[in-house]
Swiss-Prot record:
Principal localisation: cytoplasm
Active site: H49, H95
Source organism of this protein record: Rhodopseudomonas palustris (strain HaA2)
Gene: purL
Catalytic activity, EC: 6.3.5.3
Name listed for the protein in its UniProt record: Phosphoribosylformylglycinamidine synthase subunit PurL
Job of this protein: Part of the phosphoribosylformylglycinamidine synthase complex involved in the purines biosynthetic pathway. Catalyzes the ATP-dependent conversion of formylglycinamide ribonucleotide (FGAR) and glutamine to yield formylglycinamidine ribonucleotide (FGAM) and glutamate. The FGAM synthase complex is composed of three subunits. PurQ produces an ammonia molecule by converting glutamine to glutamate. PurL transfers the ammonia molecule to FGAR to form FGAM in an ATP-dependent manner.
Origin superkingdom: Bacteria
GO CC list: cytoplasm
Pathway(s) where this gene product acts: Purine metabolism; IMP biosynthesis via de novo pathway; 5-amino-1-(5-phospho-D-ribosyl)imidazole from N(2)-formyl-N(1)-(5-phospho-D-ribosyl)glycinamide: step 1/2
Length: 736
């Protein structure tokens, strides 16, 4: 006999993250008091994480269509066509709150969840990326969180067998109490064999696949829709536990039943577990769903209907099966050692009915749970405009060479080798460009094509000016893909913000989305998938607005690509784009001058497109021997990275007389690239760039073992490498 369900009280309602008006909406909708299980189901489906109730109205303005887009937002992942009946399936998603509470398991299950989103669509994962945001290095928890998250990302990806090929790692005090772990997965599928979540047909069996259900992850989606407070450590039991080896078996079994044409619809059990997957499949197919929880495989005794519906145990799928394929599908899953159980059927009623122990535990209208959750147009105010920082008003606290060495050893600009060397970035044998460059390049098997992959955002820009920051995040992804020779095709986004009930935070989200939308349109990069993570606050202190952008581009011929390393001595170094010395919100202004202030650099999207097309053309023509986009740290940091990577120095001209030297070298003007060309090609290249109206300046020549600016002290490339490589391993070893 099951235990009596708790009485529905205002305290119980509030603990489920439901506001009084939302509970009243439930009463109006079903005409009675909900059962405890029904309250849990509404809590899961109507929270921010699953319903997007604060952001959905603004997400509708994003560009999502293009001739090459096969599937846009609304499914498990986005899909783009790359020709030859090949499709790229990709998405990025957050696992922020769990990773702060339990960094290893939070990160592992973040990777596992995004991999399932991709292979649920019928794709074999070929790469993972991530964007990690940690607190101030001096904060007592930061080192522990970095260690746990990086180990978790590597532990899952390495064991599952997918390379982790790129990402971002940043540090800022605003992430002290709320780190960000954004995971991106990319897979390949046949264009004509994409599997979706919408159920079809009445009386079709609904099958539970994968690992057994336990109590781990209880209320995870609701936790991800609330602010943290001082008691957040007590939420450790709500963090899911991942098993990458079980996920590998699930991948192979799912791809096998898909190849055998067994599947009508399929959905992974992620946030809100069985509840969300069943509701979404039924609602998208305009059908009802009847579930019998007595058939659900469990690994703990005495689980209630409430617990089974809200468990977020990992490595599980829900599938609507072709009835005639039941025996064949079951044999496949048994072969792989995984559970296979028919737990329900589709119905024509448009009701979501859950039974357990012979009793009905939930009977709810399915569309209102899924497609028609509450929708808010929350008050929002624009961020105040910050003044432009004029370079001549900023005193240089140290000579340029010393400033460069200091910047290369800062937490944000130092080499992240310590991070990515813990990831297997070459498993599968298709990684052509490893982490540490502008974008990763992964070979598409059985042909000449490659994929360029990147993750980008500059949160301090988004804080200072959300609109320009949103534009810049997309533009930098565009530049990074271009810099390796890829044609940018589409993006996935992961929008991380604070409490949307605060108008200034909602204003950041609205402003960033406006900038992202404009940039996507101008740069022909539609958004095909994404995730929104709100309430990233602890005790009222929010994170920096962090709309991570995951970009995917195509190389028709991966041999026509570029890297950032200087290749040979005696080559001309060209600066493409205009340099005005914009110091506002620059890393130099913050970390050398001690001033985190000013308006961020504006982004001219027409110039971004024009400059990108020209650079890509140079790479494909073979005239560009090395390419690097300019971003954090500006011109001299980018030059140092090229020198370090190629182990070749450079002689650099002094800045133009009309500029301020430190602003010329460290300003963060947008739309710029560094390109090296052979002396024999120089005049032809300069003439070509002039004819198409793209600004270009020769600023030096490669050669030697030092980076030498005319009139300044030379710095040995070995010294630059030491500065660049040592901060992070020393920090993790407790030496700084």
């Amino acid at each position: 006999m099951s235990a009596p369900e708790p009485k529905i009280t205002p305290e119980l309602i509030a603990s489920h993250g439901l506001k009084p008006d939302e509970y009243q909406r439930i009463l109006d909708l079903i005409g009675r008091e909900p059962t405890f299980t029904e309250l849990g189901i509404f809590s899961a489906m109507w929270n921010e994480h699953c319903s997007y109730k604060s952001s959905r109205i603004h997400l509708k303005g994003l560009p999502t269509k293009a001739p090459w887009v096969l599937q846009g937002p609304g499914e498990n992942a986005g899909v783009i066509d790359i020709g030859d009946n090949q499709a790229v399936v990709f998405k990025m998603e957050s696992h922020n709150h769990p990773s702060y509470i339990e960094p290893y398991q939070g990160a592992t299950t973040g990777v596992g969840g995004i991999l399932r989103d991709v292979f649920t669509m019928g794709a074999r994962p070929i790469a993972c990326l991530n964007a990690l945001s940690f607190g101030d290095p001096s904060h007592p928890k930061t080192r522990h969180l970095v260690s746990g998250v990086v180990a978790g990302v590597g532990g899952y990806g390495n064991s599952f067998g997918v390379p982790t090929v790129g990402g971002q790692t940043r540090f800022h005090t605003r992430y002290d109490g709320n780190i960000l772990v954004n995971a991106m997965a990319v897979g390949l599928a046949d264009s004509d064999k994409i599997f979706l979540a919408a159920a079809s047909g009445v009386g079709m069996p609904i099958v539970y696949l994968g690992s057994k259900t336990g109590r781990d992850g209880m209320g995870g989606a609701t936790m991800a829709s609330a602010e943290f407070d001082e008691g957040s450590e007590e939420k450790r039991p709500t963090v899911q536990v991942g098993d990458p080896f079980a996920e590998k078996l699930l991948l192979e079994a799912c791809l096998e039943i898909m190849a055998k044409d067994c599947v009508i619809a399929i959905q992974d059990m992620g946030a809100a577990g069985l509840t969300c997957s069943a509701v979404e499949m039924g609602a998208k197919g305009d059908l009802g769903v009847d579930l019998d929880l007595d058939a659900v495989p469990t690994r703990e005794t005495g689980m209630t209907a409430y617990e089974m519906m809200l468990s977020e145990s990992q490595e599980r799928m829900l599938m609507v099966l072709k009835p005639e394929k039941e025996k064949e599908a079951e044999e496949i899953f048994r072969k792989w050692g995984l559970d296979f159980a028919i737990v329900g059927y589709t119905t024509p009623t448009k009701r979501f009915v859950v039974k357990h122990g012979g009793a009905v535990k939930a009977d709810l209208p399915i569309k209102e749970l899924g497609d028609e959750a509450p929708l808010y147009d929350r008050p929002h105010v624009p961020s105040p405009k910050l003044p432009v920082i004029h370079a001549r008003e900023v005193n240089a606290p140290m000579p340029v060479p010393e400033a460069l060495e200091k910047l290369l050893a800062t937490p944000d600009l130092c080499s992240k080798r310590w991070v990515w060397e813990q990831y297997d970035h070459v498993i599968g044998g298709n990684t052509l460009q490893r982490p540490g460059g502008d974008a990763a390049v992964v070979r598409v098997e059985d042909g000449p094509k490659g994929l360029a992959l990147t993750v980008d955002v500059t949160p301090r820009y988004c804080e200072a000016d959300p609109y320009e920051g949103g534009k810049q995040a997309v533009a930098e992804a565009y530049r990074n893909i271009t810099a390796v020779g890829g044609k940018p095709l589409a993006i996935t986004d992961n929008l991380n913000f604070g409490n949307p009930e605060r108008p200034e935070i909602m204003g950041q989200l609205v402003g960033c989305l406006k900038g992202i939308s404009e940039a996507c349109i101008a740069l022909d990069s539609p958004i095909v998938s994404g995730n929104v993570s709100l309430y990233n606050e602890t005790s009222g202190r929010g994170i920096l607005p962090t709309p991570s952008i995951g970009g995917v581009g195509l190389l028709d011929d991966f041999t026509k690509s570029a890297t950032l390393a200087f290749k040979a001595e005696g080559e001309a170094i060209l600066l493409i784009g205009e340099t005005h010395g914009w110091l506002g919100q620059s890393v130099y202004l913050r970390d050398v001058c001690g001033r985190e202030e000013g308006a961020p650099p504006p982004v001219d999207l027409a110039c971004e497109k024009r400059h990108g097309d020209v650079v890509r053309g140079m790479i494909h023509a073979g005239t560009a021997t090395a390419v690097h986009d300019l971003s954090d740290g500006g011109l001299l940091v980018a030059l140092a990275e090229m020198a370090i990577s190629g182990n070749i120095g450079a002689s650099l001209d002094a800045p133009p007389d009309s500029t301020v030297a430190h602003a010329w070298w460290f300003g963060e003007d947008q739309g710029r690239y560094l390109v090296t060309v052979k002396e024999d090609d120089l005049l032809t290249v300069l003439s070509k760039l002039k004819s198409v109206g793209v600004p270009c300046t020769q600023i030096g020549t490669t050669g030697g073992h030092t980076l030498k600016i005319d009139g300044e002290r030379a710095i040995d490339v070995k010294a630059l490498r030491h500065a660049h490589e040592h901060w992070l391993p020393d920090y993790m070893a407790g030496k700084n």
